[in-house]
């Protein structure tokens, strides 16, 4: 099969822990043709959705470990039509760019896309699960989402638990997630500013 991964730059991977690398490695082990690209490299030319791709050069023997595979991987650059792939894995880190989803809309009836484009739209951030029905509170922790600083300060002040979790709606891999303990709530103003203003990179 011809497999494409829309992802973050290859050079930024952490080989020891990156799940996308493992998918690419496994695809190569199984003999599939692999191409990678980024959101910034999607384009439309003559009404055809294309990508400036990096095509993985097939190796006579694929290294057994993802780390060695990463070190030895060689690519050749090529402009390819997205509809020419059998499968496209959407592996870009959140928050997702709606323009990328619009590009994928144009070929979703021709290519199998993982994950589904509409599913990506609906579950683009942590609001998706926070709004799910869990009347008994047995699955989803009590969750407060707001950009109203005074409201959040009242929530924190009156919270009976000794610990609370603070996290941005967007982000990935635990980025920006902290445990707020009762004894550390004196600096809550600066923490809320960090999350609400988005100064923490992926925070909002």
Q: In which residue ranges do the predicted regions lie?
A:
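Conserved N-proximal alpha/beta basic substrate-recognition cap immediately N-terminal to
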Residues: 12-142
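Extended, domain-scale alpha-helical bundle/helix-rich regions
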Residues: 7-11
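Short acidic-hydrophobic, aromatic-tinged amphipathic segments that line or gate anion-handling sites
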Residues: 143-148
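Extreme N-terminal starter segment of soluble prokaryotic enzymes
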Residues: 1-4
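Phosphate-binding site of ATP-dependent enzymes
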Residues: 19-20, 149-165, 169-204
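Short, well-ordered coil/turn residues at beta-beta hairpins
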Residues: 6, 89-92, 168
């Amino acid at each position: 099969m011809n497999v494409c991964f829309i992802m973050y730059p290859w050079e930024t991977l952490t080989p020891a822990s990156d799940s996308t690398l493992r998918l690419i490695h496994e695809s190569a082990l199984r003999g599939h043709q692999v191409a990678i690209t980024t959101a910034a490299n999607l384009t439309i030319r003559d009404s055809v959705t294309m990508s400036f791709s990096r095509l993985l050069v097939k190796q006579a023997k694929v290294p057994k470990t993802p780390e060695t595979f990463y070190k030895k991987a060689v690519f050749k650059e090529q402009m390819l039509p997205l509809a020419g792939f059998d499968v496209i894995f959407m592996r870009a880190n959140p928050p997702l760019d709606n323009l990328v989803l619009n590009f994928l809309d144009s070929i979703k009836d021709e290519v199998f896309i993982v994950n589904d484009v509409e599913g990506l739209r609906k579950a683009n951030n942590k609001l998706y699960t926070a709004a799910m029905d869990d009347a008994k509170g047995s699955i989803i922790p009590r969750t407060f989402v707001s950009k109203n600083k005074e409201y959040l300060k009242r929530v924190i002040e009156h919270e009976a638990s000794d610990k609370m979790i603070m996290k941005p709606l967007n982000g990935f891999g635990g980025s920006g997630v902290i445990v707020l303990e009762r004894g550390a709530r004196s600096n809550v103003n600066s923490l809320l500013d960090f999350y609400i203003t988005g100064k923490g990179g992926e925070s909002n």
